[in-house]
Amino acid sequence: MKKTILFLLAFISVSVSAADFTVTSATIKNGSTLTNKHVFNGFGCTGENVSPALKWENAPAGTKSFAVTIYDPDAPTGSGWWHWTVVNIPANVTELKEGASSKALPKGAVEGRTDFGKPGFGGACPPQGDKPHKYIITVYALKTDKLDVNGEASGALVGYNIGFATLAKASITATFSRPAAK
């Protein structure tokens, strides 16, 4: 009888454990192809360059801030391509509205420089005719309320700082490609 009760208590404690940290988007579904709304406008691309809506939940205990990155590991650079980095998002914020980049970010949030050379969001823009590229959108729960980076920080520098402060992360991935030039 005691063994049965202990087993049931152990099972119940596992079942009641915290839910996983997750991210979703009303504008980009996991595994989908990006629409023109989230494609860069420049560099040979003619998209609307609008940052996606993101919502996250079940951050772990001890979360003091959040960071968001969008990264293309398939860019033919040898080091991928950073499309968006946002840090110092307050712990009480659990979403970014579509188009938040540069105009509607939470107070204190900082956008780093994309690999297009400017701070803010830079949408997808793979080379024409290249295979579909993956765009990994990640929200990080951080154990610090502020990372010491500014708007001139590269994606690599932001990623380095995020790496030392991460409690948990959640990602969704989308793809995009452009037809070969005629």
What are these regions (language model features)?
Residues 4-14:
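Sec-dependent N-terminal signal peptides
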Residues 18-182:
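N-terminus-centered regions that define maturation/targeting leaders and the start
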